[in-house]
């Protein structure tokens, strides 16, 4: 069964790779588009769901006390591309192309800030 078919059937909860993890970013965005999933649910396929399945309760989501590296994603020629990476609260990577203006957050009390 293809991953997108499993997601459509409600039985695909994790997208993972043992070879090229960078493809997971594109896979999450494709799952959102092709399976008509809200982006937060599609991103959970590559973040919180795998962490939960591996019993890694200290990571997988952005929350106080959790470990996290954070990326900002832009769209270059229709493809999601990492524009910035933060590790331990420090900017460690910035590409030479701009971030896409984010949509309003769906979570009450969450504020998005643009830098750069």
Question: What are the functions of these language-model segments?
Answer:
Residues 1-26:
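Short acidic/histidine-rich active-site segments
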Residues 36:
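H/E-rich (His + Asp/Glu) clusters that bind or coordinate divalent metals
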Residues 25-33:
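Short, small-residue alpha-helix embedded
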Residues 29, 40-43, 47-116:
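Active-site microenvironment of metallo-dependent hydrolases
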